[in-house]
């Protein structure tokens, strides 16, 4: 086992503090509308230019192992805030640095670290409760656009396109971000339920222009097995032919004579038909077939539940207003399922998302939820160069998370004002001793840091602005760092999602509190360089080998 190096007490706090200082100073220059860019060197390709706090934090590794531990702990604050709320990483880092710096001063002055932490925790609990009180719901498109704009570093085009996407696919809809091909951002919306399986034979195409099979008001047959024997299908096909309506067959697979018969019937015009494979694999396929059944008002023909294909009737089939099948995907528009059943299914999937611990499963469940509840929107990000594309795409993704958070928990005045407004709630926090009271004061001073940093990044005197904002009666009154004006932050469109501010404060206090109460650090001792072999001085004796010439 490698040898270890230990540090104790004040040495620990100083080492951690230095590491946090380096990381936080690099991150906090990006805060606010006048925040600066940070250029990150990459081992290959062009450097990345970013104003995203968590991207900067992730790049930082320090040489001194003790300092690095401090930096890594604050990096955890930024990452966790990004995971929980999608934004607010820089605010969280600034808060963590502030709490730690103020906390270390108190510990070195001889106060009890555990009581300081308890005081900080009590202050944060009171502040979060007050945040929820001043929070306003974020419902209309204008407010959503404003939140997106602020999160995308004041890029209005990004805020507007996110608000438009949310309006089109609903709050539950899936919005994905992709590289675009032009210079401008573009929005594509897929109506209805779309899954990535195309037609099994090009002979099903009936629209030569789009190379797609389009079925108006079709029946939809859902089968949870392979169909290769046509005899199973004939009774149902005859009934569908009599009804004069088209048929979409979705099965695990359709092959051999079954597929050939469907193609022949389609070409001859006996029954207009298209066949596709069911989406997904294994259990996920079963779940997705059930989703389609609920959406279209049909049943999944499965031997597991005692339904056979031969005995299936028209009552077992689903239907939709329109179905479009292309080479790569199938879209079911306006399925005729019962609204109550769809709502119940959506609730069931929501519960599964809550109970799931895997990010991958959550993402797949979220996609299923969106297909049932709303639709899918794709934001195509346009840019002139690849470097700009990467930076812009990261901003769009951040803004998307922030707007989702705003819809979830509402909005508070932005620009660091919300944290200033909750300071009054700290006056009524009950403490057990003087050290806890100092803990509350540490949190109070830290909560004013984000506003000061935003103002500092604009080049204005921070203390003057903070004082003016703090002493104003109106909850929404603040400083617009982009224009240099004072006024109502909500009216000026400077909003922060409540969830982002809350998460940043809670995560910063949690990690900074742990750091203040750290008494010992252990790390591996640096390896000593192995001594090189001594210079070959005694090789000189080999000079006598010259006499070997006589051996010839």
UniProtKB/Swiss-Prot annotation:
Gene3D superfamilies for the chain: GroEL, GroEL-like equatorial domain, TCP-1-like chaperonin intermediate domain
Assigned keywords, A-Z: ATP-binding, Chaperone, Cytoplasm, Isomerase, Nucleotide-binding, Stress response
Subcellular location field: Cytoplasm
Pfam families: Cpn60_TCP1
Primary enzyme class: isomerase
Superkingdom of origin: Bacteria
Subunit details: Forms a cylinder of 14 subunits composed of two heptameric rings stacked back-to-back. Interacts with the co-chaperonin GroES.
Matching HAMAP family: CH60
Family affiliation: Belongs to the chaperonin (HSP60) family.
NCBIfam families xrefs: GroEL, PRK00013.1, PRK12849.1, PRK12850.1, PRK12851.1
Name of this protein: Chaperonin GroEL
Organism encoding this protein: Coxiella burnetii (strain RSA 493 / Nine Mile phase I)
Taxonomic path: Bacteria, Pseudomonadati, Pseudomonadota, Gammaproteobacteria, Legionellales
Gene label: groEL
């Amino acid at each position: 086992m490698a040898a270890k190096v230990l540090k104790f007490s004040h040495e620990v706090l100083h080492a951690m503090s230095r590491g946090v200082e380096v990381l936080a100073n690099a991150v906090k220059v990006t805060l606010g509308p006048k925040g600066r860019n940070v250029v990150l060197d990459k081992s290959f390709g062009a450097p990345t230019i970013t104003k995203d706090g968590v991207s900067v934090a992730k790049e930082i590794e320090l040489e001194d192992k003790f300092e690095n531990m401090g930096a890594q702990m604050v990096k955890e604050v930024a990452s966790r805030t990004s995971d929980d709320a999608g934004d607010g990483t820089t605010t969280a880092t600034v808060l963590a640095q502030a709490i730690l710096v103020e906390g270390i001063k108190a510990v070195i002055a001889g106060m009890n670290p555990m009581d300081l932490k308890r005081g900080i925790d009590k202050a944060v609990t009171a502040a979060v409760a007050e945040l929820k009180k001043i929070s306003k719901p974020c419902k209309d498109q204008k407010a959503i656009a404003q939140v997106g704009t602020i999160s995308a570093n004041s890029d209005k085009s990004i805020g507007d396109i996110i608000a438009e996407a949310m309006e089109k696919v609903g709050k539950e809809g899936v919005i994905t971000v992709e590289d675009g091909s032009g210079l401008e951002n573009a929005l594509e919306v897929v109506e209805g339920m779309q899954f990535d399986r195309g037609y099994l034979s090009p002979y099903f195409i009936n629209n030569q222009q789009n190379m797609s099979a389009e079925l108006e008001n079709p029946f939809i047959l859902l089968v949870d097995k392979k169909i290769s024997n046509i005899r199973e299908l004939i009774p149902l096909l005859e009934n569908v032919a009599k009804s004069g309506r088209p048929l979409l067959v979705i099965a695990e697979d359709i092959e051999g004579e079954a597929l050939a018969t469907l193609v022949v019937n389609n070409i001859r015009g006996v029954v207009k038909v298209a066949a596709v494979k069911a989406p997904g694999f294994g259990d996920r396929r079963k779940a997705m077939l059930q989703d389609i059944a609920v959406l279209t008002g049909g049943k999944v023909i499965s031997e597991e539940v005692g339904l056979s294909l031969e005995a299936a009737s028209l009552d077992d089939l689903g239907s939709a207003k329109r179905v479009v099948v292309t080479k790569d995907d199938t879209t079911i528009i306006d399925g005729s399922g019962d609204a109550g059943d769809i709502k119940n299914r959506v609730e069931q999937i929501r519960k599964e998302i809550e109970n799931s611990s895997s990010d991958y499963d959550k993402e797949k469940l979220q996609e299923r939820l969106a297909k049932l509840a709303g639709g899918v929107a794709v934001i195509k990000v346009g840019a002139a160069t690849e470097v700009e594309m990467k930076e812009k795409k990261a901003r769009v993704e951040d803004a998307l998370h922030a707007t989702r958070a705003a819809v979830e928990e509402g909005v508070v005045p932005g620009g660091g004002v919300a944290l200033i407004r909750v300071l009054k709630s700290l006056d009524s926090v009950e403490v057990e001793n003087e050290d806890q009271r100092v803990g509350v004061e540490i949190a109070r001073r830290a909560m004013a840091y984000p506003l000061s940093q935003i103002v500092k990044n604009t080049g204005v005197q921070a203390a003057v602005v903070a004082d003016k904002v703090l002493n104003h009666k109106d909850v929404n009154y603040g400083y617009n760092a982009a224009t240099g004006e004072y006024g109502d932050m909500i009216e000026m469109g400077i909003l922060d999602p409540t969830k982002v501010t809350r998460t940043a404060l809670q995560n910063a206090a949690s990690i900074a509190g742990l750091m203040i109460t750290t008494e010992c650090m252990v790390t591996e001792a640096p390896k000593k360089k192995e001594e090189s072999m001594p210079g070959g001085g005694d090789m000189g004796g080999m000079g006598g080998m010259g006499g070997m010439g006589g051996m010839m």
